[in-house]
């Protein structure tokens, strides 16, 4: 099926280049501008030579960097930290920079809280993400995906398009906007806002802290206005659930609703977008895996989706803060220290995956930590993300089975999100 404009295929299972430890600098944006192969090689070196190491915080304009952090790179350690929130606390922040009052205004949601309050807040919306409820919206997901792929074909008679703007971006965005009750006319605004929030630091998206804070205020004000409307006009949507919920006998404040809203639309959009895009890139590089999946789509879909999430590792890391002194692998860390959990590294750990460099759509077992390491903060939207990924690839298989990337992706300059800004594709 080869299209002559496709990017170069690769030999599946090829390990990344060796990167000496002296060439690794997690605390520099220059390191995060390097391509994925170098990044993978760097983390392989860290797992082998310095599985726990200390790094300075990247300086971003407007953000308070604060102290450096201990980087956990081994799957077992990331898993352990995820399962012990009493020691590795999500409070006060999940990114390495310090939380400030102005940031907490918009990013103080349940993701930066611990139980019991975290669990009470999570329970408000968790019902909307159960397998049963997600199965109910299957038809809506499929309809959206079908229309997006059909439009992609209709709007591009030259059979050249950007996968991110035409499918991988709009699909999860439209679904989470539907669930939140956001009108279609506002979807593009939401898309822009989430891009700025998660793309801050990338010159193509936003490097002006004032713009970042303005966008945060805009999305917060939008959420508050939508919530105020729902206080009067009940809808069968997640925003109404937030407005009507009681936690510890109290309704959520407008500020709590706004930060909750930001979490759901940002998390519910960016991560799935990048998993789908990395998946198409991987199928382009390893076409034998695509042939294998297309020949038994339903049979392989469950393991294929998990492997795409492992391969993509859309969230690169999360930060925790130690509540007590602890020693891991002979490294002493003190109460109050920042600890970073590197999912991108845990998902390539040679001690956990026999062949971590092989993109294997039938991989089973697959103990990846792409949705977090389990425990209290396991990704709330995992069921929805799996459904969206599966349906997106099913529609590609049906409508443009030989879709292939034509250029290397434009990568997001970010330490936190494994993002792709554009991925040009073609089909016959």
Curated annotation (Swiss-Prot):
GO molecular function: cholest-4-en-3-one 26-monooxygenase activity; cholesterol 26-hydroxylase activity; heme binding; iron ion binding; NADPH binding
Keyword Hydrolase on entry: no
EC number of this enzyme: 1.14.15.14, 1.14.15.28
Catalytic reactions of this protein: a methyl-branched lipid + O2 + 2 reduced ferredoxin [iron-sulfur] cluster + 2 H(+) = an omega-hydroxy-methyl-branched lipid + H2O + 2 oxidized ferredoxin [iron-sulfur] cluster; cholest-4-en-3-one + 6 reduced [2Fe-2S]-[ferredoxin] + 3 O2 + 5 H(+) = (25R)-3-oxocholest-4-en-26-oate + 6 oxidized [2Fe-2S]-[ferredoxin] + 4 H2O
SUPFAM superfamilies tied to this protein: Cytochrome P450
Names of required cofactors: heme
Binding site residues for heme: 379
GO biological process: cholesterol catabolic process; fatty acid omega-oxidation; methyl-branched fatty acid metabolic process
Metabolic or biological pathway: Lipid metabolism; branched-chain fatty acid metabolism
Listed InterPro entries: Cyt_P450, Cyt_P450_B, Cyt_P450_sf
Keyword Oxidoreductase on entry: yes
Key words, A-Z: Fatty acid metabolism, Heme, Iron, Lipid metabolism, Metal-binding, Monooxygenase, NADP, Oxidoreductase
Entry similarity comment: Belongs to the cytochrome P450 family.
Role noted for this protein: Primarily hydroxylates the omega-carbon of a number of methyl-branched lipids, including (2E,6E)-farnesol, phytanate, geranylgeraniol, 15-methylpalmitate and (2E,6E)-farnesyl diphosphate. Also catalyzes the sequential oxidation of the terminal methyl of cholest-4-en-3-one into (25R)-26-hydroxycholest-4-en-3-one (alcohol), (25R)-26-oxocholest-4-en-3-one (aldehyde), to finally yield the carboxylic acid (25R)-3-oxocholest-4-en-26-oate. Also able to sequentially oxidize cholesterol itself, not only cholest-4-en-3-one.
Protein's recorded name: Methyl-branched lipid omega-hydroxylase
Native species: Mycobacterium tuberculosis (strain CDC 1551 / Oshkosh)
Taxon lineage: Bacteria, Bacillati, Actinomycetota, Actinomycetes, Mycobacteriales
Designated gene of the protein: cyp124
């Amino acid at each position: 099926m080869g299209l002559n404009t496709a990017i170069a295929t690769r030999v599946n299972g090829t390990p990344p280049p060796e990167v000496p430890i002296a060439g690794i600098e997690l605390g520099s944006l220059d390191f995060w501008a390097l391509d994925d192969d170098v990044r993978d090689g760097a983390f392989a070196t860290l797992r082998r030579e310095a599985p726990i190491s200390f790094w300075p915080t990247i300086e971003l304009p407007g953000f308070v960097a604060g102290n450096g952090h201990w980087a956990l790179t081994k799957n077992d350690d990331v898993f352990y930290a995820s399962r012990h929130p009493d020691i590795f606390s999500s409070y006060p922040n999940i990114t390495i920079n310090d939380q400030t009052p102005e940031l907490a205004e918009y990013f103080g949601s349940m993701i930066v809280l611990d139980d019991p309050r975290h669990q009470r807040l999570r329970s408000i919306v968790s019902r909307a993400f159960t397998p049963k409820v997600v199965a109910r919206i299957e038809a809506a997901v499929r309809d959206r995906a079908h229309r997006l792929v059909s439009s992609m074909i209709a709007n591009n008679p030259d059979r050249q398009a950007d996968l991110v703007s035409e499918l991988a971006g709009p699909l999860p965005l439209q679904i989470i906007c539907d669930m939140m009750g956001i009108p279609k006319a506002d979807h593009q605004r939401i898309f822009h806002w989430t891009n700025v929030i998660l793309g801050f630091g990338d010159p193509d998206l936003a490097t002006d802290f004032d713009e970042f804070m303005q966008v945060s205020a805009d999305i917060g004000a939008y959420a508050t206005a939508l919530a105020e409307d729902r206080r009067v006009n009940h809808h069968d949507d997640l925003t109404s659930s937030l407005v009507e919920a009681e936690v510890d006998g109290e309704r959520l404040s407008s500020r709590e609703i706004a930060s909750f809203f930001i979490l759901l639309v940002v998390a519910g959009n960016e991560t799935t977008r990048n998993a789908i895009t990395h998946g198409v890139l991987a199928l382009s590089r390893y076409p034998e895996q695509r042939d294998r999946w297309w020949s038994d789509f339903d049979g392989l879909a469950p393991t294929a989706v998990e492997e795409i999430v492992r391969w993509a590792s859309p969230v690169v890391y999360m930060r925790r803060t130690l509540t007590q002194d602890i020693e891991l692998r002979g490294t002493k860390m003190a109460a109050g220290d920042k600890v970073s959990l590197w999912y991108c590294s845990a998902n390539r750990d040679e001690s956990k995956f026999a062949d971590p460099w092989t993109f294997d759509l039938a991989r089973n077992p697959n103990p990846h930590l792409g949705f977090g390491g389990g425990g209290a903060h396991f990704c709330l939207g995992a069921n929805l993300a799996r459904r969206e990924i599966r349906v997106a690839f099913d529609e590609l298989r049906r409508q443009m089975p030989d879709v292939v990337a034509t250029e290397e992706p434009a990568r997001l300059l970010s330490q936190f999100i494994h993002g792709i800004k554009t991925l040009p594709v073609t089909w016959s």
